[in-house]
Regions:
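Functional cores of ribonucleases/endoribonucleases
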Residues: 1-104
Length: 104
């Protein structure tokens, strides 16, 4: 489970994810096939925090990626269905180490 650090933090990462995926969004609207699209970005900056299954839940991990899901209506207007921070590639080692420590 993850969360953004604040409302302002969430809005920043949603806007940045949409901006960095602008061309993909344009292509999605043109294709008119799927009603939703899942976008993601990774960053060197902390995007949020979370806990991991099979670890001590008092251990909060910083995460460095974001997923934003957009939904489109019949008029090609879209809105953010959901957005959440996720563990990035570089976050996985810390989480796996904590899982190993917890299970031993």
């Amino acid at each position: 489970a993850t969360r953004f650090l604040s409302k302002e933090n969430a809005l920043y990462w949603i806007r940045r994810t949409v901006a960095e995926n602008y061309q993909e969004i344009k292509n999605w609207i043109k294709q008119d096939v799927e009603t939703y699209i899942e976008l993601s970005i990774s960053s060197e900056l902390i995007t949020g925090e979370g806990i991991a299954f099979h670890t001590d839940w008092k251990n909060i991990f910083s995460v460095h990626s974001v997923v934003v899901v957009l939904h489109r209506d019949r008029n090609n207007l879209f809105y953010v269905k959901t957005a959440y921070p996720i563990a990035g590639f570089d976050d996985v080692d810390d989480i796996l180490d904590a899982m190993e420590e917890y299970d031993s």
